[in-house]
């Protein structure tokens, strides 16, 4: 952004769907064109009486450009589960500049580490994967990767290759286990369900880097919200028994969330830029 001159336009293509209140960060940017992909996201940013400074002049509902390729390369009936939690600001080291952080010496004492490490080592999880013939891929957040050596990764769990595209990971998986991450929208775009493991939901928004927005996980989510491992594994088996096809309210949410699933998001963005809305 620092290299944009006053005569140049800043077109914010985005890398994901905004579900939380990021107004404090985004309001500091001079954005001329703001791309969104769901009606709820668009309304939360462009409508009057919200926390954002942007309006219908800047914000457009076109769909994300990269979703065209995501849709095109999707693999149906992929027998892979991704475990992809986000991070917590209070369990990692302080920022040292650029994208690096110091290491937190007591990381393994955190509830975050203990809960996810227990899940990865669950005998029931392993048996479910064997019974239904699924593989598990663990994809930790970049801020958690420095602590990967602390996790006890069993042989049946693969570690995602961080040199490969995340889009490939989404396309080649049938189900996601996360906590609060917006990557759940990527799976939903591909009509794939999500399980939200929220063992620390009461403190999450008090200690993290952003504020809760319009999205309600239990009402708007793309799969069940659970608070303990036992419930998670029960919900997982329910979905595996159904070949990872979403059902009920979760299918309704997936079907109604995105404005476009037609492979023409790039075309719409191009036209908006060319004809200046």
Name these PLM-found stretches:
Residues 56, 151-155, 180-257:
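Catalytic binding pocket for nucleotide-activated donors in carbohydrate/polymer assembly enzymes
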Residues 3, 27, 128, 168-169:
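Structural alpha-helical scaffold elements that stabilize or flank donor/cofactor-binding regions
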Residues 32-39, 135-137, 176-177:
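A short beta-strand/loop micro-motif in the catalytic core of glycosyltransferases
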């Amino acid at each position: 952004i620092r290299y944009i001159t006053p005569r140049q336009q800043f077109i914010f293509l985005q890398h994901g769907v905004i579900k939380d209140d990021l107004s404090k960060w985004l309001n500091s940017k001079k954005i001329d064109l703001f791309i969104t992909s769901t009606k709820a996201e668009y309304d939360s940013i462009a409508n009057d009486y919200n926390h954002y400074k942007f309006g219908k002049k800047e914000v457009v509902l076109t769909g994300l450009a990269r979703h065209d390729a995501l849709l095109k390369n999707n693999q149906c009936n992929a027998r892979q589960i991704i475990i992809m939690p986000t991070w917590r600001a209070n369990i990692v080291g302080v920022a040292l500049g650029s994208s690096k952080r110091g290491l937190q010496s007591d990381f393994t004492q955190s509830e975050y580490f203990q809960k996810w490490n227990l899940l990865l080592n669950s005998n029931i999880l392993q048996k479910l994967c064997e019974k239904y013939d699924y593989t598990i891929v663990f994809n930790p957040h970049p801020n958690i990767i420095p602590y990967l050596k602390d996790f006890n990764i069993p042989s049946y769990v693969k570690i995602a290759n961080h040199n490969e595209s995340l889009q490939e990971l989404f396309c080649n998986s049938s189900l996601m286990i996360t906590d609060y991450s917006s990557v759940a929208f990527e799976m939903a775009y591909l009509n794939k369900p999500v399980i939200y493991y929220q063992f620390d939901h009461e403190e999450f928004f008090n200690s993290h880097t952003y504020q809760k927005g319009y999205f309600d996980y239990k009402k708007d989510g793309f799969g069940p919200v659970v608070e303990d491992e036992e419930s998670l594994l029960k919900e997982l088996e329910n979905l595996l028994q159904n070949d990872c096809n979403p059902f009920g309210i979760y299918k309704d949410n997936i079907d109604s969330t995105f404005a476009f699933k037609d492979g023409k998001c790039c075309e719409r963005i191009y036209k908006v830029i060319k004809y200046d809305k």
